[in-house]
Curated annotation (Swiss-Prot):
Keywords: Cell outer membrane, Ice nucleation, Membrane, Repeat. GO terms for cellular component: cell outer membrane. Belongs to the bacterial ice nucleation protein family. InterPro entries: Ice_nucleatn (IPR000258). It is a peripheral membrane protein. Ice nucleation proteins enable bacteria to nucleate crystallization in supercooled water. It comes from Pseudomonas fluorescens. Contains 122 imperfect repeats of a consensus octapeptide A-G-Y-G-S-T-L-T; further on a 16-residue and a regional 48-residue periodicity is superimposed. The gene is inaW. This is Ice nucleation protein. SUPFAM superfamilies: Phage fibre proteins. One of its GO terms (molecular function) is ice binding. It is found in: Cell outer membrane. It comes from the Bacteria.
Length: 1210
């Protein structure tokens, strides 16, 4: 009886594990390793006998596996409290759903009926009782024909209440409730409620509620609520709420809320809220809120907010806010805010803000702000701000600002500012500013400024400034300034200035200045100045000056000056001066002077002078003088005098006099006199005199004199004199003199003199002199002199001199001199000199000199010199020199020199030199040189040289040279040279050379050379050469050469050569050559040759040759030859030859030839031998052999004629 079997029902998890972690098999034996024969639940396998009794071992999860197992009756132990049965081992006979498991038991119970006595009861409903008690409800098996059994379980029901539980459960249900729970669970339900939970769960609900949860979950719901959750979840809901969550989730909701979330999520909602989230998300919402998020997201919202976000996003919102964002985004908003962003974006906003941005953007806004931006943008705004920008832009604004910009722009604004800009622009503004600019512009403004500019413009303004400019303009203004300019203009102003100019103009003003000018004008003003000029005019003024001029005029004024002039006029005034002139006039005044003249007049005045003259007049006056003259007058005044003269006048004054004269006047003054004269005047003054003259004047003064002259003047001064002259002047001064001259002037000074000249001047100075000259000047200085000259100047200095010149100048310096020159200059320096020159210059230096030159320059240096030059320059250096040059330059150096040049340069170096050049350069080097060149270069070197060149270059080297070249290059070398080239190159070398080339190259070498080439290359070599080539190459070699080629190559060799080729190659060799080739090759050789080829080959040789080939080949040879081939071959030979072929081959021999057919009989090879001229075998007739070893004549129509077999040798 104890060995009989019974059926036990239980459930496992979806992965076939029970609550203790034991994995049950699908079918077969299962055993408990920790079995103890007690009535406790632990240490054993458990279940419901015949599926009846307590349901403690049964799970209500939808994915649970229902297991039916067979247990030996003797192993059964009935557990306490009617909790089922316990057993140490069992055999699983069925795994499926609840329905299939119960069906299996019903179908198989009759098989165990003999052993079922007193173990089975028929399931019946008990009478309904009113009390509630802790019970273990039974799980029924609804079959009517099951045998009677012992009473091992009891079923009890409350009034209109259905309760189903297992051991350790507590169920309390009100009227019309249904409670189902696993073991160890606690459920409490109000009226008309339904609670279903797994083991270890806790469920509490009000009336009309529904709770469904997995094992270990906790559900608490008010009335009219619905809770659904996976195992291990916690749900708490007020009335009229609906909560749905996956396993391990936590949901808390007040009255009227709807929460839906994936597993592992956390949801907290106030009344009347709706939360939807993916697994692992966290949602917290106040009342009347709606939150929707993807998995792994976090959302926090106050009352009345609406949040929508993709997976992995974070949203935080105050009350009545709306947030919409893509996956991975972060949004933080105060109340009454609306945020919309693409994936991966970050948005932060205070109360009442509206933010919209593309993916990957960052937005930060204060209260009541509006931000709109494209993807990848960054926006930061204070309260009550509005920002709009294209993708990739950056905008930063304080409270109350409005910013609008195109893509890729940058905007920074203070409070209450307005910025509008095109794409790629940069705007920075202080508070209460307004900036408007086209694309690519840059604007910077302080508080309260207004800037408007076209595209590509630059505007910088202080506080309370207004800037308006066309495209491409540049404006810089201090506070309280107003600037207006056309396109391409430049305006710079300090605080409180007002500038207005046409297009292409330049305006520079100090504080509180006003500038008005036409297009193309230039204005420069100090503070508190007012400048007005027509188009193309130039005005320069210091603080507090007022200048007014017509178009094309030039005005220069000191501080607190007033200048008024017609169009085309020129005015120059010191401080506190007033100048008034008609159109085309020229006025020059020192400080405190007052000049008034008609049109076309010229006025020159010292300080605190007053000059009045008619139109076309010339006035020259010293300090504290007053001159008045008509046009064409001449004025001469003594010391402290005041002279006034008209056109062409002559003025003469003694010491302390002040002279003023018109054009063409002559002035003579004593010592301490001040002379001022017009154009073409002549002035002579005594000791300590001050002379001022116009254009073309002549001035002569003794010691301590100060001379000032106009254009073309001549000045002569004594000791310690100071001379200033205009263009084309001539000045001669004694010791320690200071000379200043205009363009084309000539200055001569002795020791310790300082000379300054204009363009085209000539200066000569003694010892320790300092010379400065303009363009085209000529300067000559003694020892330790410093010379500075403009363009086209000529400077000559002795030892330890410092020379600086402009473009096109000529400099000559002595020992240890340093020379600097502009473009196109010519410099010649002595020993240890340093020369620097601009473009197109010519420099010549001796030993140990350092030369630096610009583009197109010519440099020549002595021993151990270092030369650096620009593009297209020519450099020549002595021994051990280092030369560096730009593109297209020409470098020539002697022995042991290092040369570096740019593209297209030409280099020539002596012995042991190293040359490096750019593309297309030409290099020539002496013995033992190293050459490196770019693409398409030409290199020539003597013996023991190393050449490296780029693509398409040409290299020629002497004996024992090494050449490396790029693609398509041409290399020519002497004997014992090593050549390496790229694809398609041409190599020519002398005897005993090694040549290596890329694909498609052509190689030609002398005797005893080794040639290696890539695919498709051509090689030609003299006697005793070794050739190696890639696929499809062509090789031609002299006598006694060895050729190796790849497949499909063509080889031609002289007598006694050895040829080795790949398949499909063509070989031609002279007499007594040895040819070896792969399959599909063609071999042609002269007499006494040896040919070896693979299958599908074609071999042709002269007399006394030996031909060996594979199957399917054609062999042709002259007399006295030996031909051996495989199957299906055609062998043809001359007289006295020996032909060997296998089955399927055709043999044709000349007179007295032997034909041998190799036959296979299944065990061994046998030979069928015939001879021409005997046995009815004719010469020059093709013969074959059939499968029966019969020799047949191969007819032209492919028909076979048998030969007398009796005559055939076995």
């Amino acid at each position: 009886m104890k060995s009989e079997k019974v059926l036990v029902l239980r459930t496992c998890a979806n992965n076939m594990t029970d609550h203790c972690g034991l994995v049950w098999p699908i079918l077969g034996l299962v055993e408990c390793k920790f079995w103890e024969p007690t009535i406790k639940l632990e240490n054993g396998l458990t279940g419901a006998l015949w599926g009846q009794g307590s349901s403690a071992q049964l799970s209500m999860n939808a994915d649970a596996k229902w297991v039916v197992c067979e247990v030996t009756m003797g192993d059964l132990i009935f557990l306490e409290n009617n909790e089922g049965v316990k057993f140490p081992r069992a055999e699983v006979v069925h795994v499926g759903t609840r329905s299939s498991a119960l069906g299996y038991i019903s179908d198989n119970v009759s098989k165990h009926e003999a052993c079922s006595s007193n173990l089975i009861e028929k399931f019946t409903f008990s009478d309904v009782k009113s009390e509630t008690r802790n019970i273990s409800p039974a799980l029924p098996v609804t079959v009517d024909n099951m045998p009677n059994g012992v009473n091992r379980s009891t079923t009890v029901r409350n009034t209109q209440t259905l309760e189903t539980a297992v051991y350790g459960s507590t169920l309390t249900g009100a009227n019309q409730s249904q409670l189902i729970a696993g073991y160890g669970s606690t459920e409490t339900a109000g009226d008309s409620s339904t609670l279903i939970a797994g083991y270890g769960s806790t469920g509490t609900s009000g009336s009309d509620s529904s709770i469904i949860a997995g094992y270990g979950s906790t559900g608490t719901a008010g009335s009219d609520s619905s809770l659904i959750a996976g195992y291990g979840s916690t749900q708490t809901a007020g009335g009229d709420s609906s909560l749905t969550a996956g396993y391990g989730s936590t949901q808390t909701a007040q009255v009227g809320s709807n929460l839906t979330a994936g597993y592992g999520s956390t949801g907290t909602a106030g009344p009347d809220s709706s939360l939807i989230a993916g697994y692992g998300s966290t949602q917290t919402a106040g009342g009347e809120s709606s939150l929707t998020a993807g998995y792994g997201s976090t959302q926090t919202a106050q009352v009345g907010s609406d949040l929508t976000a993709g997976y992995g996003s974070t949203g935080t919102a105050g009350s009545d806010s709306s947030l919409i964002a893509g996956y991975g985004s972060t949004q933080t908003a105060g109340g009454d805010s609306s945020l919309t962003a693409g994936y991966g974006s970050t948005q932060t906003a205070q109360v009442g803000s509206n933010l919209t941005a593309g993916y990957g953007s960052t937005g930060t806004a204060g209260p009541d702000s509006s931000l709109i931006a494209g993807y990848g943008s960054t926006q930061t705004a204070g309260g009550e701000s509005s920002l709009t920008a294209g993708y990739g832009s950056t905008q930063t604004a304080q409270v109350g600002s409005d910013l609008t910009a195109g893509y890729g722009s940058t905007g920074t604004a203070g409070s209450d500012s307005s910025l509008i800009a095109g794409y790629g622009s940069t705007q920075t503004a202080g508070g209460e500013s307004s900036l408007t600019a086209g694309y690519g512009s840059t604007q910077t403004a302080q508080v309260g400024s207004d800037l408007t500019a076209g595209y590509g413009s630059t505007g910088t303004a202080g506080s309370d400034s207004s800037l308006i400019a066309g495209y491409g303009s540049t404006q810089t203004a201090g506070g309280d300034s107003s600037l207006t300019a056309g396109y391409g203009s430049t305006q710079t102003a300090q605080v409180g200035s007002d500038l207005t100019a046409g297009y292409g103009s330049t305006g520079t003003a100090g504080s509180d200045s006003s500038l008005i000018a036409g297009y193309g004008s230039t204005q420069t003003a100090g503070g508190d100045s007012s400048l007005t000029a027509g188009y193309g005019s130039t005005q320069t003024a210091q603080v507090g000056s007022d200048l007014t001029a017509g178009y094309g005029s030039t005005g220069t004024a000191g501080s607190d000056s007033s200048l008024i002039a017609g169009y085309g006029s020129t005015q120059t005034a010191g401080g506190d001066s007033s100048l008034t002139a008609g159109y085309g006039s020229t006025q020059t005044a020192q400080m405190g002077s007052n000049l008034t003249a008609g049109y076309g007049s010229t006025g020159t005045a010292g300080s605190d002078s007053s000059l009045i003259a008619g139109y076309g007049s010339t006035q020259t006056a010293g300090g504290d003088s007053s001159l008045t003259a008509g046009y064409g007058s001449t004025q001469t005044a003594g010391h402290g005098s005041i002279l006034t003269a008209g056109y062409g006048s002559t003025q003469t004054a003694q010491e302390g006099s002040s002279l003023t004269a018109g054009y063409g006047s002559t002035s003579t003054a004593g010592p301490e006199s001040s002379l001022i004269a017009g154009y073409g005047s002549t002035q002579t003054a005594g000791h300590e005199s001050t002379l001022t003259a116009g254009y073309g004047s002549t001035q002569t003064a003794q010691e301590d004199s100060s001379l000032t002259a106009g254009y073309g003047s001549t000045s002569t001064a004594g000791f310690n004199s100071s001379l200033i002259a205009g263009y084309g002047s001539t000045q001669t001064s004694g010791y320690e003199s200071i000379l200043t001259a205009g363009y084309g002037s000539t200055q001569t000074a002795q020791d310790n003199s300082s000379l300054t000249t204009g363009y085209g001047s000539t200066s000569t100075a003694g010892y320790q002199s300092s010379l400065i000259a303009g363009y085209g000047s000529t300067q000559t200085a003694g020892y330790e002199s410093t010379l500075t000259a403009g363009y086209g100047s000529c400077q000559t200095a002795q030892e330890q001199s410092w020379l600086t010149t402009g473009y096109g100048s000529t400099s000559t310096a002595g020992y240890e001199s340093r020379l600097i020159a502009g473009y196109g200059s010519t410099q010649t320096a002595g020993y240890k000199s340093i020369l620097t020159a601009g473009y197109g210059s010519t420099q010549t230096a001796q030993e140990e000199s350092s030369l630096t030159a610009g583009y197109g320059s010519t440099s020549t240096a002595g021993y151990a010199s270092s030369l650096i030059a620009g593009y297209g320059s020519t450099q020549t250096a002595g021994y051990d020199s280092i030369l560096t040059a730009g593109y297209g330059s020409t470098l020539t150096a002697l022995d042991s020199s290092t040369l570096t040049a740019g593209y297209g340069s030409t280099e020539t170096a002596g012995f042991g030199s190293s040359l490096m050049a750019g593309y297309g350069s030409s290099q020539i080097a002496g013995y033992g040189s190293t050459l490196t060149a770019g693409y398409g270069s030409t290199q020539m070197a003597e013996r023991d040289s190393t050449l490296t060149a780029g693509y398409g270059s040409t290299g020629t080297a002497g004996q024992d040279s090494s050449l490396i070249a790029g693609y398509g290059s041409s290399l020519t070398s002497g004997m014992r040279s090593y050549l390496t080239a790229g694809y398609g190159s041409t190599l020519i070398s002398g005897l005993q050379s090694v040549l290596t080339a890329g694909y498609g190259s052509s190689l030609t070498s002398g005797i005893r050379s080794s040639l290696t080439a890539g695919y498709g290359s051509n090689q030609i070599a003299s006697h005793k050469s070794s050739l190696i080539a890639g696929h499809e190459s062509t090789q031609i070699a002299g006598h006694k050469s060895m050729l190796i080629a790849g497949k499909g190559s063509s080889q031609t060799a002289g007598s006694r050569s050895t040829l080795i080729a790949g398949a499909n190659s063509v070989q031609m060799a002279g007499d007594r050559s040895r040819l070896t080739a792969g399959a599909n090759s063609i071999q042609t050789a002269g007499d006494r040759s040896k040919l070896l080829a693979g299958s599908n080959s074609y071999l042709t040789a002269g007399d006394r040759s030996k031909l060996t080939a594979g199957d399917d080949c054609v062999l042709m040879a002259g007399d006295r030859s030996k031909l051996t081939a495989g199957k299906n071959c055609v062998l043809t030979a001359g007289a006295d030859s020996r032909l060997i072929g296998s089955l399927g081959s055709t043999l044709s021999g000349g007179e007295n030839s032997t034909l041998i057919f190799r036959c296979w009989d299944g065990k061994r090879y046998t030979n069928v031998v015939v001879k021409t001229g005997t046995d009815e075998v004719e010469a020059d007739v093709p013969y074959q052999i059939d499968e029966d070893s019969n020799v047949l004549i191969k007819a032209e129509d492919n028909s076979d004629t048998p030969v007398d077999q009796s005559q055939i040798q076995p």
